[in-house]
């Protein structure tokens, strides 16, 4: 019987006298069709190595293993340690937010891997940020389940209220695609929100050299930190307002431009202009 079976999960929880922990965002996938769709979207092939964060009872883990992937799983809850050890995976009982991802290569995981995970929703943003800040060149693809609201934010287009610094951050590193929506009924227990799967194809080369990443993201964070402000006002602690006005004019934007107006490429152009004239 598959680990996506509700009966199997219920039986396991009864055996260990456990229950899903709300504080760890434990909502377990119990829909085999959704698992197969995640696998198809992820592009995982036999022989790939895959990082899974928060495997829980192991429904997605099992699907990845059956596909022939070599799975590295980071699970915080020791309740699942013994059952996950029954699968042929490299398991770490650890807090993924604190786990040094550079250790993966040190432990022998050579070449680019993939990330496939049903992310704990309360730490989705920190985990996505960590993946690309710590080891951006480690990944071929990142395929993750998250809250639908967050999925729409990170796949938003310029001009909308959902578009923000996280959108730009992820699009800097990857081509980001909203794959499909997942209803609450596909989980146990049912979450109070809809979910979605997002697929990211990581770029071979990034728009800026590594030494400039933090400076660029400081600009975009400042821009969206007070999104009701004009862009020049939002950046006043980083650059003189007149310098921002001049750069915007060179890009054919008005002085009244707001942060959500600029695309990733336009923010990169703005950054180059501001850096060269600062």
Curated annotation (Swiss-Prot):
- Superkingdom, taxonomy of origin: Bacteria
As recorded in UniProt, its EC number(s) are 2.1.1.182
Subcellular location(s) of the protein = Cytoplasm
Q: Which residues bind S-adenosyl-L-methionine?
A: 27, 29, 54, 75, 95, 118
Q: Which InterPro entries match?
A: KsgA/Erm, rRNA_Ade_diMease-like_C, rRNA_Ade_Mease_Trfase_CS, rRNA_Ade_methylase_Trfase_N, rRNA_adenine_dimethylase, SAM-dependent_MTases_sf
Q: Which Pfam families match?
A: RrnaAD (PF00398)
- Name the top EC class: transferase
Question: Which keywords belong to this entry?
Answer: Cytoplasm, Methyltransferase, RNA-binding, rRNA processing, S-adenosyl-L-methionine, Transferase
Reaction(s) catalysed by this chain's protein = adenosine(1518)/adenosine(1519) in 16S rRNA + 4 S-adenosyl-L-methionine = N(6)-dimethyladenosine(1518)/N(6)-dimethyladenosine(1519) in 16S rRNA + 4 S-adenosyl-L-homocysteine + 4 H(+)
Query: What are the GO cellular component annotations?
Result: cytosol
Q: Which GO terms describe its molecular function?
A: 16S rRNA (adenine(1518)-N(6)/adenine(1519)-N(6))-dimethyltransferase activity; RNA binding
Predominantly, its location class is cytoplasm
Stated role: Specifically dimethylates two adjacent adenosines (A1518 and A1519) in the loop of a conserved hairpin near the 3'-end of 16S rRNA in the 30S particle. May play a critical role in biogenesis of 30S subunits.
Question: Which family is this sequence assigned to?
Answer: Belongs to the class I-like SAM-binding methyltransferase superfamily. rRNA adenine N(6)-methyltransferase family. RsmA subfamily.
Which NCBIfam families does the UniProt record give?
ksgA
- Name-wise, this protein is Ribosomal RNA small subunit methyltransferase A
Q: Which organism is it from?
A: Chlamydia caviae (strain ATCC VR-813 / DSM 19441 / 03DC25 / GPIC)
Q: Which gene encodes it?
A: rsmA
């Amino acid at each position: 019987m598959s680990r996506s079976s509700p009966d199997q999960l219920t039986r396991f929880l009864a055996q260990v006298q456990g229950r899903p922990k709300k504080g760890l965002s434990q909502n377990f996938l119990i829909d085999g069709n959704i698992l197969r769709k995640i696998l198809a979207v992820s592009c995982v092939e036999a022989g790939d190595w895959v990082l899974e964060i928060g495997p829980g009872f192991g429904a997605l883990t099992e699907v990845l293993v059956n596909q022939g992937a070599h799975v590295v799983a980071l699970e915080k809850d020791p309740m699942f340690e013994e059952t996950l050890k029954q699968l042929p995976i490299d398991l770490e009982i650890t807090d993924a937010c604190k786990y040094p991802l550079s250790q993966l290569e040190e432990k022998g995981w050579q070449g680019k891997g993939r990330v496939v995970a049903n992310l704990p929703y309360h730490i989705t943003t920190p985990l996505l940020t960590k993946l690309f800040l710590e080891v951006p060149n480690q990944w071929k693809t990142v395929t993750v389940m998250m809250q639908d609201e967050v999925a729409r934010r990170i796949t938003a287009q310029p001009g909308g209220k959902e578009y923000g610094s996280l959108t730009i951050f992820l699009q800097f590193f990857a081509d980001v695609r909203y794959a499909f929506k997942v209803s609450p009924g596909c989980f146990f227990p049912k979450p109070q929100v809809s979910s979605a799967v997002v697929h990211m194809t990581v770029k071979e080369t990034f728009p800026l050299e590594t030494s400039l990443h933090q400076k660029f993201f400081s600009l975009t964070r400042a821009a969206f930190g007070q999104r009701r402000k004009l862009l020049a006002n939002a950046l006043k602690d980083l650059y003189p307002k007149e310098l921002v006005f001049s750069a915007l004019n060179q890009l054919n934007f008005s002085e009244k431009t707001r942060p959500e107006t600029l695309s990733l490429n336009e923010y990169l152009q703005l950054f180059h202009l501001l850096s060269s004239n600062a």
